[in-house]
Amino acid sequence: MKRAFMSETAIVRTLAPSIAGVGLFIFVVLTLANATDGDSGMSAGACAVSAMSPIIIMNSLAGYDNQNGWERYRATLPFSRKDIICARYLCTVVFSIVMACAATLLNILALPLFDPMGIPSTCQTIFEIATASAASMLISLMMVFLAQPLFFRFGHMEALRLSVGLFALLGCLTMAALSSSNPISNWLMSIAGGNPDPAVLGCLCAGIAVLALALCAISCTVSTKVYRVRDL
């Protein structure tokens, strides 16, 4: 499985510059556009990057499988199909965490620039930004885990047609329900209360992480079963 994971990371490294460029553009635009909305608006850029990263990485890796017959060639390498599945899930999670951490760090470094707008650079603000970014990433990962078996069962293009509706529907429902440019942050704050305790936010984030981990295990098991019987 280690060799399969190294193979996946090598692919992601070739895609990293373009993914990072898109992420940086979205971060700058959303941060500047929503900075006047207070703490939740200030974290909009970091949350958006954290949420989009798992989806972009999943689609990028699935798309690479179809290039130059890589998926069929990989089947001839000394990797079991279970190793390939586990490596794909692990790679998606690891690079999603890296992107979320980078976005959060950029957001924290940018805080002093927005002091004139009434956004203080306090530990509470930093913790809320980090928690909202982590929650955004975890919720996005859960959507990825729901869609990932489709990619291993039907291939990239067919699965993309099937899953894009899922992502669009969930995104529209979330935005409509919360009426916010940063729904995850506002959702966390509404549960935690007007003056959220860091312990409460931490517990909420930990609960989401447990759900994501359970869904990851189920999704990985399903993907392994469907990929083993798939004719490459």
Where on the chain are the PLM-derived regions?
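Alpha-helix N-cap/helix-start motif at helix boundaries, enriched for small hydrophobics
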Residues: 83-85
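Short helix-to-coil transition segments within interhelical loops
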Residues: 75-81
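Hydrophobic alpha-helical transmembrane segments of membrane proteins
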Residues: 1-69, 87-232
